[in-house]
Amino acid sequence: MKNYHHYYLPIQTHYLLDAYGNQRRVRILLPKDYEKHAQKHYPVVYMHDGQNVFYSKEAYSGHSWKLIPLLKQTTEFPDMLIVAIDNAGEARFDEYTPWPLSAENQTLIGFSGGAGQVYSEWVVTVVKPYIDAHYRTKPDREHTLCAGSSLGGLIVAYMGSAYPKVFGSLGIFSLASWVSEEAFLDFVSNHPLQKDTKVYIQVGTDEGNEVDQALLNKNSNQAYIDSSLWYYQTLLQGGHEMDYLWLRILADEQHFEKYWADHFGEFLAFSFAEK
């Protein structure tokens, strides 16, 4: 375990064996006064694509989610732990897709998909228990949040439905469920969330890129919007109350960490607001 201090907020690093026997980096951002309050327990936000969470220099796009300055500068949120789980590199696509892709998409993308169920089980049965055992968390679902973007958003939505008694708030940015839309919506329909689960759904109107367009028979910008709309509608049709849902379609925003970072504070405010 390594300990670093940046912006007066301590980050601790652990390496946990993943479902395939590989060492996976998991970092925990702690409140600055964590060591001073030995009896205090904290809510936890679990985030995927952990390489992109804290520092722009190691983020895939060159821009992180900027969570350290956000938490340092914002006083309206309760103190919390941020758990950043690194993705599996080249195996990221497989790990964040719960269902195998169609043969056509497998050929186009070069990945088969379908390892998301194993990954999700690892997060719930290995990572979360480890964090709860080694840190002063509030382990109940009300204080357990999960957030991610793109395919990371897909795995968040899946985990919310697969483990409704674990996660009380979901942050789903630029949902890329279009890679397996039918299977995704069918699963969500048949695995309802707890009635008070909060779901923040954000998508921009300029999400698509050339890679996405090559995989789709329609406008890739619209594909991302449709995925978010269909997910939102499926939750409503399943009886989820609108007060616990927040769908945001943001003009001109793109598939990029900058835009997710710009609104992460709003996800946290929504999650921690009293109903």
Model region roles, listed by residue range:
Residues 1-275:
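Non-catalytic cap/lid and distal C-terminal segments of serine-dependent acyl enzymes
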